[in-house]
Amino acid sequence: MTETKYIFVTGGVVSSLGKGIISSSIGKLLQARGYNITIQKFDPYINIDPGTLNPYEHGECYVTVDGMETDLDLGHYERFTDIQTTKANSLTTGRIYKAVIDKERHGDYLGKTIQVVPHITDEIKRNVKLLGKKCGYDFVITEIGGTIGDIESAPYMEAIRQLKWELGKNALNVHLTYVPYLKAAGELKTKPTQHSVKELQSVGIQPDILILRTEKHLNDDIRKKVAAFCNVDFDCVIQSEDLPSIYEVPVNMQNQGLDTAMLKKFGIEPGEKPTLGPWKSFLERRDKATEEVHIGLVGKYDLQDAYKSIREALYQAGTYNDHKTVLTFINSENLTDENVAEKLAGQDGIVICPGFGQRGIEGKVVAAKYTRTHNIPTFGICLGMQMMVIEFARNVLGYKDANSREMNEKTPHNVIDIMEEQKNITDMGGTMRLGAYECVLKQGSRVCDIYGKTHIQERHRHRYEFNNDFQKEYERAGMMCVGRNPESDLVEIVEIPGLNWYIGTQFHPEYQSTVLHPHPLFVDFIKHSIDNQKKVYG
């Protein structure tokens, strides 16, 4: 393909319709046809990145290989397409404005008055086209966060309007709207969609394809009505009905001809429809699974999206073990020595989740002690690993006051300590150890056997690490340091070989797990959780 094609995904009526899933599905379908694609997300908030946002408000903060803290939708992009994203795939209004202001301070605008139009819109346009120019993608899919009509989204809509005009046949708009079902009237209502499209048209954008989110099936009469009132071809009105799994969406979109309609709009001969063989095999394997494996997530954020990548990695791993993964959230704030047996009852394995701050950590320590002493498969991630280390120090090494410097700066047994390069940092945003780092695994360790190699790369997001001053004591007592960064000598993985499955990682393996390539640690953890279930229940 000689010229990069640009697809803009916008949303209307309400937020949280699933623009990220639709963008990922579009990418998957085009990728299945052999095209080189990438997906980027523009978020209209003024934060530089979501790294300091409350998980209750924003959900999980996803980390790219090059260390960018991003929206959780980038996790969907990677899980669907198996393509790693970078800083260029995630933009916010804060970063756009900062870039423009920095240029103004540098004198790049030669004394001109800096305005939203053209300077902010030009910077948006530059970032949209950057990936196409720099990397030569066939398709660049750009998801615009928020909803048409939001004040925050106005500069992005103006930039899209200009790009559609400038790029002509090489640009296309997919608009996602909502068709509500009124139970009392027994009717599906298209008026919100019509108003959303009118709002889009009022800023100069005519949608090329409409995707209608709905809880009920839309018949052809409704689709024809929407097509007529919104100036969209009938075959370009696609419905996205609620499905049991987000991984069914690409197949559903393909069955309705979404990829075919897009290619025709671009003047490209669609050719033969791809089979999506490996993807469908995953879905078939998931559907055939009749047995369940129960995993408890010990954490402090009860919003499901706060641990989105962990949840998806566990679901994927369950499928590859021919089991359905059933997840139960266990609030660590409510865990005590007195109730832990009751709270963790019925779980075949436990994940001690990541997080920050004092709240809920003692409950994680309680969980780590219970699973260690009862030989329950346990997977500690980031802060979860640190709590496993602290619990071991308190109850095996005998350091009852052992803690992390994050929680107690004056603890004499700081088994978790702040990294040297972090000690003089005062800013919170974008200053942690972020992105992919190399890790060398100890020969003969369980994790080395799981990975099948000694050198790996995993993504990090933390300031605190295992204190190497205590390593010999830990290893003499049975907790082994089996993964290290070769440059800094930081401990990245601990395990207790004598237990069924007791592994903690300082990194976030969930970021590397995709539908077609599940992460080996999660697959092996689920396998041993299933084995534990058989031992307990026969």
Report residues per predicted region.
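Active-site proximal loops enriched in glycine and acidic residues that flank catalytic Cys/His/Asp
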Residues: 11, 41, 214, 241, ...
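Short beta-alpha connecting loops at secondary-structure transitions
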Residues: 57-65, 243-247, 352, 373-379, ...
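C-terminal and late-domain segments of enzyme folds
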Residues: 434-438, 442-538
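Flexible phosphate-sensing "switch/lid" loops adjacent to ATP/NTP-binding sites
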Residues: 1-323, 333-349, 356-357, 363-370, ...
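Cysteine-nucleophile active-site neighborhood
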Residues: 17-20, 24-28, 32, 343-438, ...
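Flexible, glycine/charged-enriched surface loops at secondary-structure junctions
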Residues: 272-273, 321-326, 484, 535-538
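Short low-complexity, flexible loop/linker segments enriched in glycine and/or proline
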Residues: 52-55, 225, 393-396, 497-499
